[in-house]
Amino acid sequence: MRNPIWFMLVLGFCLVRASASFAAEHQTDAEPSPELSLQGKAFYNQFCRNCHGISMVNAGTSSFDLRKFPHDDRARFINSVMNGKNSMPPWGDILKPDEIEAIWAYVRTGGKT
């Protein structure tokens, strides 16, 4: 390359962008607001309760026990809801992103909202 300073600036910019993107993707979520958790409870009762149960567990079924879902794994939760997993159907065409976020907020409370 003819201009090593230009190359270093571009490389530095790319590294900063990549690290910021990685940090944003892997950050631990702050505690959800009570309002968002209450909205999530309503969506949970409408869309999730039949399979996952009133208390986030449905004994005697193959449904995942949501009480045990890692509270720091938002990306996994969003992916599972959007695309489905095992016997869970995908909800990405039915639920809006803000509704999924609200359900995630409720799940993080362990059903204590």
Predicted regions and their residues:
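Bacterial N-terminal signal peptides that target proteins for export
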Residues: M1-M8
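Bacterial N-terminal signal peptides
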Residues: M8-R17
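Generic anion/oxyanion-binding catalytic loop in active/binding sites
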Residues: G12, D29, S55, L66, ...
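Electrostatic cytochrome c docking/interface patches
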Residues: S21-F43
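Gly/Gly-Pro-rich "capping" loops immediately C-terminal to redox-active cysteine motifs
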Residues: P34-K41, G53-M82
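Charged, alpha-helical scaffolding/interaction elements associated with membrane systems
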Residues: N45-Q46, N83
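Short cysteine clusters
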Residues: C48-C51
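Axial heme c-ligation environment in periplasmic c-type cytochrome domains
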Residues: A59-R67, M82-T113
